[in-house]
């Protein structure tokens, strides 16, 4: 099936391109991006603390903030990572965080701690709860795959396959951290599980690339028919 412009759509499309490239930066709206997850989001081992909605406090959050600023986006990235958290605990607090911040984007990445005690199906169930909670409040969720664990982590590949399927099913962006870092993980990790500074910078790039897939899609889909 060939995708084409609807009749009369081209002038509107050209106007929107002009608006986004010229007028958009002049009328930039500040919005919030919530980084939500476990100790990897919080910033351990590089920053040994939990996030509580803080800004510039650790993990990939400061690097992502810099990428957004360089791209001319008026965004504030807040760190809501909590060390040792399982997906069940994450799902129990995600509504509270969304209500507090009213973010535009929710960056969701958890599951590593679950695999010490629970099944990959438990991760899927609870990550689905987090995605649905975001969508129900009009927040754009982006789902992250979990990182390698060179200390002997098990079922990571199977879990990430389920997360990829979830993102496809919900039609939301996937930040595939595992694929991005697995070949060079030894140089990107501090302890085999948590990233080092270079690893967190790489994570920020993966999140940023996933965020870019959202911005124009709703506008363009209104202009195109199949």
Name what the model sees in each region:
Residues 46, 52, 115, 148-219:
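Catalytic His-Asp segment of secreted/periplasmic serine-dependent ester chemistry enzymes
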């Amino acid at each position: 099936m060939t995708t084409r412009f609807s009749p009369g759509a081209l002038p509107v499309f050209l106007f929107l391109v002009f608006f986004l490239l010229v007028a958009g930066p002049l009328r930039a709206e500040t919005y919030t991006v919530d980084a939500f997850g476990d100790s990897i989001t919080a910033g351990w081992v590089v920053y040994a603390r939990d996030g509580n909605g803080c800004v510039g406090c650790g993990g990939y959050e400061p690097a992502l903030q810099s990428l957004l600023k360089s791209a001319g986006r008026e965004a504030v990235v807040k760190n809501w990572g909590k060390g040792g958290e399982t997906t069940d605990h994450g799902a129990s607090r995600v509504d509270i965080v969304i209500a507090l911040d009213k973010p535009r984007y929710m960056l969701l990445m958890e599951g590593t701690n679950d695999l010490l005690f629970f099944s990959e199906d438990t991760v899927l169930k609870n990550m689905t709860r987090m995605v649905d909670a975001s969508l129900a409040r009009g927040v754009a969720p982006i789902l992250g795959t979990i990182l390698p664990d060179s200390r002997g982590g098990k079922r990571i590949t199977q879990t990430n396959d389920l997360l990829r399927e979830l993102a496809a099913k919900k039609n939301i962006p996937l930040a595939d951290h595992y694929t991005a870092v697995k070949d060079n993980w030894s140089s990107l990790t501090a302890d085999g599980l948590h990233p080092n500074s270079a690893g967190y910078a790489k994570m920020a790039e993966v999140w940023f690339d996933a965020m870019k897939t959202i911005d124009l899609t709703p506008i363009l889909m209104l202009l195109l028919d199949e």
